[in-house]
Curated annotation (Swiss-Prot):
Its main location: membrane. This is Probable urea active transporter 1. The keyword Calcium does not apply. The lineage of its organism: Eukaryota, Fungi, Dikarya, Ascomycota, Taphrinomycotina. NCBIfam families: sss. It comes from the Eukaryota.
Length: 664
């Protein structure tokens, strides 16, 4: 039994204190934006941020939403198991989905610019039955992602501080629920930014401690020597020469395919990513998603290349938490490679940094899931089927209630998984089996006019039946005719289930579209979710920009995807190249350079891009403090904004009707 490095009081201080602190900060920020920047918290703004978010914040939000606890913990786990290939297979296998999703984000902006959720688009094109099918898949995705966040976060926090795991499961969502309620998706974007910056600072600290400052390692060359010794002591089955320093890893390649397939589901079917596309300014969707995808790659790659390999290098040292034993399979599956490596590397400081790192990763991604669930319930269930004429305030309160219920329901579900010994690693591999069957149909809804309604409706159902049967049959065949957590969680059953889940719906769609042919006119979709422009010229210009962005997104996404999943890794896999010390040093240096690019892209650039808004809020706040009254009167039926020119003191009153707001 490994003794916790920190006390329970430290854990409660972070989980409760910092969570409530963030909630208080976002309440203050939301109030400031309302009072000094004329941002009214209507249901529209709560769920879509009035379609106004710029490139930098979109990129930051994409990075933060995709930086789960598993991004840091599972990537380090796979590197510990398979060596340097594990970090790359995780990063590349989960990066390309964001880049390819850029295509769908632009198509959503072109064809349904005023939608609140992707499911609204499904209903408008394919009817209520298809809407119900995709509603189920969307909720399965949100439930799995939230469960994984809570399972991974609670296991790590409990191991580092000794906190009761059940208490962590219930306390982690509290602060997130509060600040998401008060700020909506705009608060999610802003906290995403803060969380991302903190995560990057901690990762850079770990990297510098490993490769430059720490006497335990101190350089890439010394870590290389340690990894050579580790490979000699316990070679990796399926790796070239049993080495940790090669991309030729049989089990690593299997994980790559599982990772690649499964993560299509958690991006393309998660309403949270569609929400960010909806909230983005039309001109910001393309650069925001591409910049976010490229920036995100460095996080798991460098985190795992550093901490996963540090665990291998220091595991035989007396100060490693499990010494003299290696980590158990359960500890590895629970994602404890990174925290144990941090403790061995930096002691109590490493434990504190890990606690903060995991807290930030869990809460930032959880806020996106809460908003996604809230939006679906508000617009796709309540307004669609319960109260079609619901007022803005009623929709806002409904959204608040739904995210509270979902947050605490997931705490209970995560607790059940904990007692059932279902780990974060198991859930991560299982995702694709359950949610990938909706990926191809969702893509077809936005891209192809000749896919029939029956094909879109039926193919996900047939796909999930096929994937579950395949998964369980392979598990039973390879596991001695018994189905357990161990046998169903093995690589081969998960590989089979994920691949069938992703690809079989494509076959079903083709067959059903041939049997039941149909051609859909996307102009009908545009008419349903049209944006209102001040002039016809503005509309023409916007259409031209989005058409151009559509072409660019397709070309850019395909080129970058090919580089990440084919051109870079497979030649190294095919040759079975064993890294030299010089090559390994260069590999690490590229990772460090890339993480500083990420800092610029999602840390510095959003501040520069939003400098005018920051100046306006600070100026108006200063004017209010020093006696110049700034009024912002907000009503449910409309908005009356009274502004003051700080230089001249002159007033201007602008009236907006409710219908004008809803059309923005």
């Amino acid at each position: 039994m490994v003794q916790p490095e920190l006390t329970q009081s430290v854990g409660y201080g972070i989980v409760v204190g910092l969570g409530l602190g963030f909630a208080a900060l976002m309440i203050f920020v939301s109030w400031s934006l309302k009072k000094f920047n004329n941002e009214n918290q209507t249901s529209e703004h709560f769920n879509t941020a009035s379609h106004s978010v710029r490139t930098g914040l979109v990129a930051s939000a994409v990075v933060s939403s995709w930086t789960w606890a598993s991004t840091l913990l599972t990537s380090a786990q796979k590197t510990y198991q398979y060596g340097v290939s594990g970090a790359f297979w995780y990063a590349s296998g989960a990066c390309v989905q964001i880049l390819l999703f850029t295509v769908l984000a632009i198509e959503l902006k072109r064809k349904a610019p005023n939608a609140h959720t992707f499911l609204e688009v499904v209903r408008a094109r394919c009817g209520p039955i298809a809407h119900g099918v995709f509603l189920v898949f969307a909720y399965i995705t949100n439930i799995l992602v939230m469960a994984m966040l809570l399972c991974g976060g609670s296991a790590t926090i409990s191991s580092v501080t000794g906190m009761n795991t059940v208490a962590v499961c219930f306390l982690l969502p509290v602060g997130v629920i509060i600040y998401t309620m008060f700020g909506g998706i705009k608060a999610t974007f802003l906290t995403d930014y803060i969380h991302t910056v903190i995560i990057l600072v901690i990762l850079i600290m770990f990297s510098l401690a490993t490769y430059s400052a720490d006497k335990k390692i101190g350089s890439p060359g010394k870590l290389y020597d340690m990894l050579k010794e580790a490979g000699d002591a316990h070679p990796v089955a399926g790796n070239a020469q049993g080495s940790y320093l090669t991309m030729r890893s049989q089990e690593g390649a299997i994980f790559f395919i599982i990772n690649l397939a499964g993560n299509f589901g958690t991006v393309f079917v998660d309403n949270g990513y569609w929400q960010k596309a909806i909230a983005a300014n039309p001109a910001s969707a393309l650069p925001g998603y591409i910049l976010g995808g490229l920036a995100w790659f460095a996080i798991p790659w460098l985190a795992a290349t550093t901490m996963g390999l540090v665990a291998l290098g220091l595991e035989n040292k007396p100060y490693f938490p499990t010494y003299p034993n290696r980590m158990s399979d359960l500890e590895v599956s629970e994602g404890l490679v990174l925290p144990y490596a941090a403790i061995a590397l930096m002691g109590r400081a490493g434990a504190n940094a890990t606690l903060l790192l995991v807290f930030m990763a869990v809460t930032s991604a959880a806020s996106a899931e809460l908003i996604a669930v809230s939006s679906i319930f508000t617009y796709d269930i309540y307004k669609q089927y319960v109260r079609p004429r619901a007022t803005g305030k009623e929709l806002l309160y409904t959204g608040h209630a739904s995210l509270i219920v979902f947050g605490f329901a997931m705490s209970g579900f995560a607790t059940g998984l904990y007692y059932g010994q279902v780990s974060m690693g198991y859930l991560y591999l299982l995702m694709g089996v359950l949610v990938c069957p909706a990926v191809v149909p969702a893509t077809c809804v936005m891209l192809f006019s000749r896919v029939s309604t029956i094909a879109v409706t039926v193919s996900p159902v047939l796909g999930i039946i096929s994937s579950i049967i395949t998964w369980l049959v392979v598990a039973r065949a390879e596991g001695g005719k018994t189905l357990t957590i161990e046998t169903t969680g093995a690589n081969n059953p998960m590989l089979a289930g994920n691949v069938v889940g992703l690809l079989s719906p494509a076959l079903y769609i083709l067959i059903l579209s041939i049997i039941f042919p149909e051609k859909y006119d996307f102009n009908r979709l545009l008419a349903t979710f049209a944006m209102h422009f001040s002039s016809e010229e503005d509309e023409i210009q916007q259409t031209k920009k989005l058409n151009r962005a559509s072409v660019i997104s397709k070309v850019a996404a395909l080129i970058i995807t090919a580089a990440f999943i084919i051109l870079w890794p497979w030649p190294m896999y095919g040759t079975g190249y064993i890294f030299s010390k010089r090559f390994f040093t260069g590999w690490v240096v590229v990772g460090l350079i890339w993480i500083f690019f990420t800092v610029f892209a999602v840390g510095i650039f959003p501040l520069w891009e939003g400098r005018n808004d920051i100046y306006q809020v600070v100026s108006n706040m200063a004017a209010s403090i020093f006696g110049r009254k700034v009024n912002d009167i907000v009503e449910d039926e409309g908005v009356v904004v009274e502004t003051i020119s700080i230089g001249s003191g002159s007033k201007e009153k602008v009236n907006f009707e409710k219908k004008d707001i809803e059309s923005v």
